[in-house]
Regions:
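Feature recognizes metal-dependent phosphohydrolase scaffolds
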Residues: 1-242
């Protein structure tokens, strides 16, 4: 009679070496499988936007505008999200608010001297910013988006980004969150943080291609800004040679 025994798979010395390294981060089969599932799912997400800027030549104001507007990407996202439901002038205004929230916000608020008018504008603006932020976050995993959330109010923004407004009970819940933000005089802070988050999520990586110095007045301000960017690479140009 033939043997019914099942052959036991063997592992080579080389395989054991790599398995032992893998086990440091993934000590169980379940942990390794979970990581594979997550990575395979992430690979199916759209590629993040990469922003290329060259020939800065010390022109700090022009550079800051390119950075804040992502060379038109932010306005494009605003138009895609709000579409024909919002007039073109209002969409342009919202895009400018995203570019320069601290500078633009006081100017927009000054149009509404009455408290009830200002509160209505706050609510509308917060909801529109949440819609834009939700759209630009769709290229990223929820874990990555959470890592970008500002401290202090990140959990509230996370709730609003994953709102399901088709659920009546949740609609009341999210409406109460926005109302509480306004009632507790936190609307300005949330607007500014949402604007910064939109800019952060809209561009995955920034590439600076040469010629930072020469001609312009403040290349140092450009360097200062680049030092705070979340993901940038840099190539020196011939004008940067001392």
């Amino acid at each position: 009679m033939g043997s019914n025994s099942t052959a036991i798979p063997t592992t080579s010395v080389a395989e054991l070496k790599y398995l032992s390294l893998l086990a440091r981060d993934y000590p169980t089969q379940a942990a390794a499988a979970s990581a594979v599932i997550s990575l395979e799912a992430t690979a199916k997400l759209p590629k993040g936007t990469e922003h290329y800027i060259s020939d800065l030549h010390g022109e700090d104001e022009a550079f800051i505008h390119l950075l804040n507007s992502a060379s038109g990407v932010i306005r494009e996202k605003v138009d895609l999200v709000l579409g024909e439901n919002v007039p073109k002038a209002i969409r342009a205004e919202l895009a400018t608010l995203i570019y320069y929230p601290a500078r633009k916000l006081p100017l927009l608020k000054a149009r509404y001297p009455e408290r009830f008018e200002l509160e209505a504008w706050y609510r509308q603006t917060l909801l529109r910013l949440i819609d834009v932020c939700r759209f630009v976050s769709s290229k990223h995993t929820r874990e990555y988006v959470r890592s970008c959330l500002p401290q202090g109010c990140g959990h509230i923004i996370d709730e609003l980004l994953h709102a399901h407004f088709e659920d009546h009970n949740k609609t009341l819940y999210y409406g109460q969150i926005v109302g509480s933000i306004i009632a507790n005089d936190r609307a300005d802070a949330f607007i500014i943080r949402l604007c910064e988050l939109i800019k952060r999520l809209a561009v995955d990586k920034l590439h600076i291609i040469g010629d930072l110095f020469d001609r312009g007045p403040r290349p140092d301000l450009i360097l200062d800004r680049l030092m705070t960017h979340h993901n940038v690479d840099f190539q020196w140009g011939n004008h940067d040679v001392v």
